[in-house]
Amino acid sequence: MRIGIVCYPTVGGSGVVATEMAMALAARGHDIHLLSYDRPGRLRGGIPGLRFHEVAVTAYPLFRYPPYDLALATRMLEVREEAKVDLFHVHYAIPHAVSAFLARSM
């Protein structure tokens, strides 16, 4: 199965869970596409079937935090079309589920 996993790249908590899940699913033969704005700290290189897709986020001086949701939705759509992803697992409701909803609506 082709699975997209969206997570934060943190070295603790959800970033660890999502990254470990991605590596375990790849080890079972699934085609995994991990999306985040930075490479997760626990992600090891050279794992067959596991590909990292960076989400480019543009910083605007107007906003305190970069507008990640639309950039993520756009990247999810690109990965879905490039890799023919069957499903996405989004590891947080906000903003990841919002981005998934936007990507599906595009």
Language-model features: locations:
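Short glycine-/acidic-enriched loop or helix-start segments at secondary-structure transitions
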Residues: 15-17, 44, 97-101
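Short secondary-structure boundary/capping segments
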Residues: 41-44, 105
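A short acidic, often aromatic-flanked loop/helix-cap motif at beta-alpha or helix-coil junctions
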Residues: 42, 57-63
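Short helix-capping segments at alpha-helix termini
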Residues: 27, 105-106
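Residues lining the SAM
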Residues: 91
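N-terminal subdomain of nucleotide-sugar transferases
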Residues: 1-41, 48-53, 83
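An amphipathic, basic-hydrophobic alpha-helix
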Residues: 61-87, 95-105
